[in-house]
Amino acid sequence: MTIGWHFDNTYLELPKTFIEEIKPTPVHDPNLVILNKELARDLKLDFSNIDNKDLAKLFSGNVLPSDTCTIAQAYAGHQFGHFTMLGDGRAVLLGEHLVNNTKRFDIQFKGSGRTSFSRSGDGRAVLGPMLRNI
């Protein structure tokens, strides 16, 4: 699929304690619900020659762009007044998409399955809350 991805992944330069290389868990018969065409234009991506079935495979993580090295990230922060070790428990980063070789945009699949940072969940995400994020 040629849509204009230009991936880099500077996160791979971090010590291995900060990242886990992991592939998204496949989804059975994915469907495309919405495509943000304005964002695609801003990112210089062209989806016009790809049908919705192939886009669903791409955005579900069933098919990955060839120049990606997918990772989950470890991080920490304060949650409810306490320092907490956190991480991408249900998200996989494809990489940093470069626009005009100057701007970097993290491309991440949320709800793409368990990672070693998942606590007790299955790593999936319910559609409603994900749509509120856009």
Q: What is each stretch, according to the model?
A:
Residues 13-17, 21, 27-35, 39:
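N-terminal alpha-helical transmembrane segments of multi-pass membrane transport
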Residues 29-32, 38-134:
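Conserved ATP-binding subdomain of kinase catalytic cores across diverse folds
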Residues 1-14:
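Charged, compositionally biased N-terminal leader segments and the immediate start
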Residues 5, 21-22, 61-62:
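Hydrophobic alpha-helical segments, principally membrane-spanning helices and signal/leader peptides
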